[in-house]
Amino acid sequence: MTSSGPGPRFLLLLPLLLPPAASASDRPRGRDPVNPEKLLVITVATAETEGYLRFLRSAEFFNYTVRTLGLGEEWRGGDVARTVGGGQKVRWLKKEMEKYADREDMIIMFVDSYDVILAGSPTELLKKFVQSGSRLLFSAESFCWPEWGLAEQYPEVGTGKRFLNSGGFIGFATTIHQIVRQWKYKDDDDDQLFYTRLYLDPGLREKLSLNLDHKSRIFQNLNGALDEVVLKFDRNRVRIRNVAYDTLPVVVHGNGPTKLQLNYLGNYVPKGWTPEGGCGFCNQDRRTLPGGQPPPRVFLAVFVEQPTPFLPRFLQRLLLLDYPPDRVTLFLHNNEVFHEPHIADSWPQLQDHFSAVKLVGPEEALSPGEARDMAMDLCRQDPECEFYFSLDADTVLTNLQTLRILIEENRKVIAPMLSRHGKLWSNFWGALSPDEYYARSEDYVELVQRKRVGVWNVPYISQAYVIRGDTLRTELPQRDVFSGSDTDPDMAFCKSFRDKGIFLHLSNQHEFGRLLATSRYDTEHLHPDLWQIFDNPVDWKEQYIHENYSRALEGEGIVEQPCPDVYWFPLLSEQMCDELVAEMEHYGQWSGGRHEDSRLAGGYENVPTVDIHMKQVGYEDQWLQLLRTYVGPMTESLFPGYHTKARAVMNFVVRYRPDEQPSLRPHHDSSTFTLNVALNHKGLDYEGGGCRFLRYDCVISSPRKGWALLHPGRLTHYHEGLPTTWGTRYIMVSFVDP
């Protein structure tokens, strides 16, 4: 047998065998062994798996003629992934070769298909076969399988692989017929042992000119040789190079435990992706959803398995997906009591939007694996479920056409590539370690950064993916896909698909969105999203920075100057203002507005206010990051020639009330410049208030919520806080560059 993958697995090997020893001038016309028209590739496959279709795609690329044996038949050749077997392949080949028993001008290459890729042309294959001087050339490997005791009977080899591998051989039809007609064993007997014993017969080996491809000129078996193989990129083609023997193999065989490495190579060879042409096969199987017809029915499964920042925004994005909601059934599993209010707020909209909905809450006490099994099985058991779309709450799909795009890719399983903003952390692994955990593939960074764009066969995907419903029903009918082992649910899921020979595809052809970081999300805060400026800066900005801030920074005429050198610009969103005030009131320990202040190094405040420092609520670092990221650039734009490090020791929220502290006496600030942000609405939350700059006799009487006043501090801008006459006024103040 060949040391191949789970049976029925078949290997694709494309060697070429020599005609009888004779000079070119002695050969009759029509019997040129380098004539591709006289070459036939025979392979074996009982089902049109993705591996088989990949093999055919590579054969079609080079215009090979392929004959497949066994399609639609039952595999009775044993579990060749775990033990000996594969004899059924020899029986099928024996019968097929009867057709060519007298074809002396014909060359046959036999290869498996599920784990084989062709990397060279028929002409190259035939030339290399002729150069081998053989009538039948087998592929070679480093292991004597399945009987190590036969190793000593093999001829010594100076350089190269010593032992026969039956996953690929090439030879004259008459010679192959002479070999396989000797098969008289059972279907689950070992094919490789059969060929090995014939090869080890010295008389037969010499009589039939049997040889091994010791240096991988034609056949590259990957098992035991991964360190020898590298990708060789040409402008519009990719192949592998064996650096140990400096050869360019024509047939690449992922025998034994090297299926994932073959998948990696198959992303490139022969034209999966090239530096000049990009993705060569991406559009080959695409199927555009026809207009005017209802699109496929989708089961959308959403999982909230841990405390997750910005969940209300995630739920609102579900309503914006560019896909007819009447064709979507929503399943939502929430494992967190903390998020129940968020889901309750959005659930009426979700119920009205989608064709059907189901909510499973924390009271069900389902593990993440059990919840995922439940959702997937609901699709599996529904004949009308055409696609299963799994989406975790820590994904941010900014491309609203994601679902439509993935369906049109027409793959059994496909995920959109998502990564954390500015990080290499993503929702896929490019390779696995020997114990099936994360390993970084050579192209991982290029894929995450989209320097190489295409559709990729990877060993692990998570957090967002689409699966065909019929794939679940026919190829993965068991329910316990996620919870059937002790491993992480996503790892168990991926292994289940890999073990079935189902490819896990990843598309990075489009910008789909990003992932959220969740590990440091602290739900002890009243509004924990406020603290996400470091971990999830893009989402934080979208939620908490004023929608017109960027336009103001770009000089689009939004910034105002109500007083000399006093600039007014939009900075914080309404939500940021509200949550900042709520955090302060929730903390509740307002200073008394006295001169004595134990929070200060000297214990004395010259111009006291009723306030709470950012440091008191644990928000100092986050606020300083806001100053660096948003206030610093604006300051340098408004005051040309000044460079700020946006340092501030005093950052605090001030509360003005008529019965508490209604105003603030004239003073200079201990800063190079001061930031003063209104946190609520005049006329709605309070009356009065405002700021007067005494030297210029200039008053700003109606501060706008979320807008910041930016002005010089010490020396020039002597100012006072005007009395608040009704309600409560809140402002955020920073003394920057003291």
From Swiss-Prot:
Subcellular location: Rough endoplasmic reticulum; Endoplasmic reticulum lumen; Endoplasmic reticulum membrane; Secreted
EC number, as in UniProt: 1.14.11.4, 2.4.1.50, 2.4.1.66
Cofactor(s) needed by this chain: Fe(2+); L-ascorbate; Mn(2+)
Residues reported to bind Mn(2+): 112, 115, 253
Region (Accessory region): 295-520
Keywords for this protein: Dioxygenase, Disulfide bond, Endoplasmic reticulum, Glycoprotein, Glycosyltransferase, Iron, Manganese, Membrane, Metal-binding, Multifunctional enzyme, Oxidoreductase, Secreted, Signal, Transferase, Vitamin C
GO CC, any one term: extracellular space
Record-level Gene Ontology MF annotations: iron ion binding; L-ascorbic acid binding; procollagen galactosyltransferase activity; procollagen glucosyltransferase activity; procollagen-lysine 5-dioxygenase activity
Protein origin, superkingdom: Eukaryota
Signal peptide from the UniProt entry: 1-24
Glycosylated residue positions: 63, 548
Record-linked SUPFAM superfamilies: Nucleotide-diphospho-sugar transferases
Amino-acid positions noted as binding 2-oxoglutarate in the UniProt annotation, renumbered to this chain: 599, 656, 676, 729
Comment on protein domains: The N-terminal domain mediates glycosyltransferase activity.
Function: Multifunctional enzyme that catalyzes a series of post-translational modifications on Lys residues in procollagen. Plays a redundant role in catalyzing the formation of hydroxylysine residues in -Xaa-Lys-Gly- sequences in collagens. Plays a redundant role in catalyzing the transfer of galactose onto hydroxylysine groups, giving rise to galactosyl 5-hydroxylysine. Has an essential role by catalyzing the subsequent transfer of glucose moieties, giving rise to 1,2-glucosylgalactosyl-5-hydroxylysine residues.
Full protein name: Multifunctional procollagen lysine hydroxylase and glycosyltransferase LH3
Origin species: Pongo abelii (Sumatran orangutan)
Gene name, Swiss-Prot/TrEMBL: PLOD3
